């Protein structure tokens, strides 16, 4: 694990994988996940020529909490990290609930971000019909996200279950997943990464989880304002964030390309890891 002491005194935890001198890509992990989320076979990342940097958001893993954080005030943390690593331009990748953070970085650092890749993304929740494009659990957050005491109670419950028995927690998470995801995580190496990532997410309790919910109430920008090229990958069988959500997000982004993986689920990022990473080597300046 690597850490950076930010200007305001907080700690930012990150990891680096892949090719040391490869194309830098900063990954935004999903909701209830951590910097440990990546394909466990590092050879694939090396072969793709990618220097992958994964980061714990505030309250997750080893990164200090940041009460009241938003998508936009996450950007200075990433900017400081890129400066520390002496990275001028870079790509941004995300999975699931990491997508608003990826787009926020593209919005605020448009002169430094050359490409954005979103996999199984969540779109804005404050639009008509949003609840029709996601699992009922996200519908709950959409409906009650403004009730902070209720969300804190829900977050503490999530953290307690994850910290008491991570294998059981992962089983329950996957129970309602489509068959492609269940098959994917039958691979024990992937399953261990999955469990390790979620266990790390709740290391400090529910701070990260709760912070993500509160941040999602208001993005602070619109997809129409993103001028960076965006590639979206989504599985047709995703039952957490439906493919229609990714398609609608692509329609709102000025320079987006949407690719559907037929017969794949929410975690198609791991099955198609190499292809997704290769997106960053296309049309490099």
Label for each model-derived stretch:
Residues 57-73:
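Cap/lid segment of the alpha/beta-hydrolase catalytic domain
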Residues 73-91:
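Conserved acidic catalytic loop of the alpha/beta-hydrolase fold
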Residues 137-221:
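Alpha/beta-hydrolase
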Residues 226, 232-234, 238:
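Short beta-strand/loop motif that positions the catalytic acidic residue
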Residues 239-245:
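Conserved alpha/beta-hydrolase "acid-adjacent" motif
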Residues 255-285:
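Catalytic active-site module of serine/aspartate enzymes centered on a nucleophile-bearing elbow/loop
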């Amino acid at each position: 694990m690597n850490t950076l002491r930010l200007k305001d005194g907080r700690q930012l935890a990150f990891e680096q994988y892949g090719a040391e001198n490869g194309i830098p890509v900063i990954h935004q992990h999903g909701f209830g996940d951590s910097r440990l989320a990546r394909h466990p076979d590092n050879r694939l990342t090396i072969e793709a020529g990618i220097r992958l940097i994964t980061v714990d958001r505030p309250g997750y893993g080893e990164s200090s909490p940041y009460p009241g954080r938003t998508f936009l005030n996450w950007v200075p943390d990433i900017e400081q990290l890129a400066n520390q690593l002496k990275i001028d331009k870079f790509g941004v990748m995300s999975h699931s609930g990491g997508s608003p953070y990826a787009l926020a970085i593209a919005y605020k650092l448009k002169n430094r971000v050359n490409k954005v890749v979103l996999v199984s993304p969540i779109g804005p929740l404050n639009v008509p019909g949003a609840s029709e494009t996601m699992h009922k659990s996200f519908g709950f957050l959409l409906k009650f996200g403004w009730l902070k005491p209720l969300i804190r109670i829900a977050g503490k419950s999530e953290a307690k279950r994850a910290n008491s028995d991570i294998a059981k927690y992962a089983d329950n998470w996957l129970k309602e997943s489509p068959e492609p995801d269940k098959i994917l995580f039958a691979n024990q190496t992937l399953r261990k990464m999955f469990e390790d990532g979620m266990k790390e997410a709740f290391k400090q309790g529910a701070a990260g989880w709760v912070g993500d919910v509160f941040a999602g109430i208001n993005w602070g920008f619109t997809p129409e304002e993103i001028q960076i090229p965006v590639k979206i990958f989504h599985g047709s069988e995703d039952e957490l964030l439906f493919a229609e959500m990714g398609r609608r997000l692509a329609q709102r982004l000025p320079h987006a390309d949407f690719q559907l993986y037929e017969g794949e689920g929410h975690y198609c990022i791991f099955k198609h890891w190499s292809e997704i990473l290769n997106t960053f080597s296309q049309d490099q300046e």
